[in-house]
Amino acid sequence: MFDKLEAVAQRYDELTQLMAQPEVATNVTLLQQYAREQRELEDIVTTYREYQAAQRAIAEAEAMLDENDPELRALAQEELDTQRKRLATLEEQLKVLLLPRDPNDSKDVIMEIRQGEGGDEAALFAADLFRMYTRFAESRGWKVEVDSLTENGIGGIKEVIFQIHGEGAYSQLKYEGGVHRVQRVPATEARGRIHTSTATVAVLPEVEETEIEIKPEDLRIDVFRSAGHGGQGVNTTDSAVRIVYKPGTPEEIVVTCQDGRSQIQNRERAMTVLRARLYAREQEKRQREIGASRLAQVGSGERAEKIRTYNFPQDRITDHRIGQNFSNLPAVLDGELDKIIEALIVYDTAERLRASGISNN
């Protein structure tokens, strides 16, 4: 571990020297590249230097234990105990910082929510989830853009595709992919019976055009008049866009966007969603090829995987991947997801540490 830390610290200092060179300072692209690389190393280097400072403090305190003055020895022992605890804490932090980063963590996110089993109640639950994620994003100061929304006429959602733009959006929301289940008494249930319904959530990192190639000949692009929520026409021009990737083949993907202000905007959004889906497909294929059944220890985010149950009668949310329960269900559905997300990150980090085999060498 410490050999790697030394190499990281050396590269960090090297980048500082490179950015000070006149030929780099005048090359904006290269300067940004070096600055971005240095930012990625900064937390590791800062923590490592704190670790080295703690090591020096321990050595100094140990030397003071040989003093004749009992008060000085007592102070030295106190300092030694403090710095040893600090050293152990910093060492654990360094192990986490050295874990490979998900290259998508800093990206914006595309989310898709669809009603599952349960009819209208499933559509109402899908609407609850959409509101939950929207409120969570707003609490972070992130921007939410709806690409496509299909409602069922009674306030429920059959399908919604939306984008969330914000620093680290994917790192926070990537654990939300899968089947969400709700247990509650529907408003239309006269006998008070508890019904179980589901909704499916897909979470995709936004992908740059340069990250995945899409050939124009593989696309069929249709334009049509956008419809309002519930099927009411709201636009007198053909502003809605449907993009079909490799139509009529097993690889076919259909993306429809109609909530943008113009045909150009809807086309751009549809292409963004298509790139994300193709990227996700490539990632899944790569995982299968290397024999991995999970994209992360807490779950793959596959649509068939039941990840969480929202039990209204017992005011309990259970995340099945980590076997942990959470209370205050109304607050969670109002966007207070922090405790759940933090628990998932902690669990995932611990599992990745266990699998990484990072040692103190």
Swiss-Prot record:
SMART domains: PCRF. The keyword Acetylation does not apply. Methylated by PrmC. Methylation increases the termination efficiency of RF1. Keywords: Cytoplasm, Methylation, Protein biosynthesis. The modification N5-methylglutamine is found at Q232. GO terms for cellular component: cytoplasm. GO terms for molecular function: translation release factor activity, codon specific. It holds the Pfam family RF-1. It is found in: Cytoplasm. It comes from the Bacteria. Gene3D superfamilies: 3.30.160.20, 3.30.70.1660, 6.10.140.1950. Disulfide bonds: none annotated. Belongs to the prokaryotic/mitochondrial release factor family. HAMAP family: Rel_fac_1. Peptide chain release factor 1 directs the termination of translation in response to the peptide chain termination codons UAG and UAA. This is Peptide chain release factor 1. The gene is prfA.
